[in-house]
Amino acid sequence: MIRRHSCKGVGSSVAWSLLGLAISAQSLAGTVTTDGADIVIKTKGGLEVATTDKEFSFKLGGRLQADYGRFDGYYTNNGNTADAAYFRRAYLEFGGTAYRDWKYQINYDLSRNVGNDSAGYFDEASVTYTGFNPVNLKFGRFYTDFGLEKATSSKWVTALERNLTYDIADWVNDNVGTGIQASSVVGGMAFLSGSVFSENNNDTDGDSVKRYNLRGVFAPLHEPGNVVHLGLQYAYRDLEDSAVDTRIRPRMGMRGVSTNGGNDAGSNGNRGLFGGSSAVEGLWKDDSVWGLEGAWALGAFSAQAEYLRRTVKAERDREDLKASGYYAQLAYTLTGEPRLYKLDGAKFDTIKPENKEIGAWELFYRYDSIKVEDDNIVVDSATREVGDAKGKTHTLGVNWYANEAVKVSANYVKAKTDKISNANGDDSGDGLVMRLQYVF
């Protein structure tokens, strides 16, 4: 028997309902016999309910990432030390299957680092049709496919923040809008995806900006601890008669300089403008990005790298905006466990600790480098000199997978820039950020 609780507010009612469902499920975990298909209830790693005939299922899960960082130099406007304490992500995730061939996924970000007040704080809200096997069709709001690190869940990326190359073309794999994507595993050794996405930007006729993405990955070896991964991707959008923000303002690997979800560095946080402009109608013709990705894993060791190049063609009497970047990363699990890998999606997954007492310990190093060429900047300013702006970071980190639900991380980041500085004239900075993650 389920009792109804009276709570003030819809959010409170939902929270109590989910709590009651979870508590009830703990006592009912196992197989439940019904007059139709039997129901299997699992409570390890969230709440999962499914029929034995696999026609219907749902799973309630989530992730919580609590970060704390301290940083100075380039990362702050005056060069002095600032700190930030915030929830990087706080997702409630609900997904499952309906009538076997339909999959659904809804992820809502309670930290408000995804989305906005008008569109909702949805990380994802999508429906996937799998009846055209091996091709899957996804509809709704989701992250368009571009890049190995973006394909990998934020729960299991090695560094706390993804590589800098995504900051020079942040639209290629974001989720701002709605669209359709077709994807497929090919021949048991490759993954292909293509999407058309309607962005939340319009031209003068009210027609939304359309984004087109293609990604192809060849992975003849794709077992845990034995991975060879080579990929190519391309993204394009038509910006004619549109007002689109093309500013390139990387955080240089330190989210706390400017973030939601808690307390950031406030007005002293520095996000330098490397190039581009605010949303002004008619400045740009189109925007195209292509990239390369590669990875190799052997036992507890893994290496990966990506390269990205962007060209924004000018519409008026302006110069084109060009940007490029790359990163290279090495990681090693001291306790011997390999990184898991999924060919469907062409992405790395978690590290599962073999020793329940000490967990799994991973060390890594990553080098990032970006360059932005904006010849529309013809006069030096207090923080930006004429010429190509460059940025690079060295990131050294450790991840402790205490168990399959808890992950503790610490990253040290050293940044260096050229042709761009903070208001104090600093072109280098240091930062330390830590995270406690819980997933269910």
Curated annotation (Swiss-Prot):
Regions annotated as coiled coil: none
Entry keywords, A to Z: Cell outer membrane, Chloride, Ion transport, Membrane, Porin, Signal, Transmembrane, Transmembrane beta strand, Transport
Main location: membrane
Pfam hit, one: Porin_O_P
Listed InterPro entries: Porin_dom_sf (IPR023614), Porin_O/P (IPR010870)
One Gene Ontology cellular component annotation held by this UniProt entry: pore complex
Annotated signal peptide: 1-29
Recorded topology in the membrane: Multi-pass membrane protein
Highest taxon listed in the record's lineage: Bacteria
Localization annotation: Cell outer membrane
Gene Ontology biological process terms from the UniProt entry: monoatomic ion transport
GO molecular function: porin activity
UniProt family annotation: Belongs to the OprO/OprP family.
Function according to Swiss-Prot or TrEMBL: Anion specific, the binding site has higher affinity for phosphate than chloride ions. Porin O has a higher affinity for polyphosphates (tripolyphosphate and pyrophosphate) while porin P has a higher affinity for orthophosphate.
Assembly notes: Homotrimer. Trimer pore size is 0.6 nM.
Protein name, as recorded: Porin P
Originating gene: oprP
